Design a protein with these regions (language model features):
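Active-site-adjacent loop/helix surface patches within enzyme catalytic domains
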Residues: 70-220
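Cell-envelope/ECM-targeting effectors and their regulatory/trafficking segments
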Residues: 1-82
Length: 221
């Protein structure tokens, strides 16, 4: 796309150069944002969704720098397991431990982790972890590899990417209730850079607890 293989700074610069050359002054959503919203809208109207119903485990592990690290969370599925999701593209492999400086936690704007994984595959992107509506943590690849999720090469190569399932818009509340996840909290009165935001759906408590367990496991590992 625009002569670039990855969705990173080089692609953004290429798009800006094309816009300038073409005399385009109004910017628009650059691919993934538009794709996610259209995909989520379509998925909400399909009636064949069935949750994966992941069972609790007595012991759970994630893979961090090539090692199995225990995590204090009952619902964890690795890419090598049945019902697991694997990143097939959208990352750079490393054989020496990466210097990881941060987590980048994404609001996936999808109805569930299965849909998020499909969008990532479609866009040639990847993250290390998905957190589903019921708090299930899916690991897509070893944290030792750099996933393409944060836009810039600098941030991709120094971070762990997590997509947390939440379709964001209150109009999807009926979908969550229909599929037995329950209503999401509605967040009101927030501002970003001084600009007021419209109401949006918050995360389930179980998702936030799963995220904290993941942070803790990586920190201790």
């Amino acid at each position: 796309w625009f002569g670039c293989d990855d969705f990173d700074d080089d692609l953004v610069d290429a798009i800006k150069a094309w816009q300038k050359k073409s005399g385009i002054k109004a910017d628009g959503l650059c691919g993934p944002g538009t794709h996610r919203r259209i995909f989520t809208e379509r998925q909400s109207k399909i009636d064949d969704y069935e949750p994966d119903l992941i069972k609790d485990k007595d012991e759970s592990f994630i893979v961090h720098h090539g090692n199995f690290i225990p995590i204090n969370w009952p619902k964890v599925v690795l890419w090598s397991e049945v019902k697991g999701y694997k990143a097939r593209k959208g990352y750079t492999s490393y054989y020496e431990p990466r210097d990881i400086k941060m987590f980048v936690n994404h609001w996936d704007v999808c109805l569930n982790s299965r849909s998020c994984h499909r969008v990532l595959e479609k866009r040639g992107l990847a993250v290390h972890f998905l957190i589903d509506n019921d708090g299930t943590i899916y690991q897509l690849l070893d944290t030792n590899h750099a996933a393409y999720h944060a836009g810039s090469k600098k941030h991709n190569h120094s971070s762990i990417g997590v997509e947390i399932s939440n379709a964001y818009y209150p109009k999807y509340q009926d979908w969550y209730k229909k599929n037995d996840f329950g209503e999401r909290p509605i967040i009101s009165g927030e501002t970003v850079h001084g600009a007021p935001m419209k109401d949006f759906t918050g995360f389930y408590d179980v998702q936030l607890e799963a995220l904290k367990a993941l942070w803790s496991a990586v920190h201790e590992g």
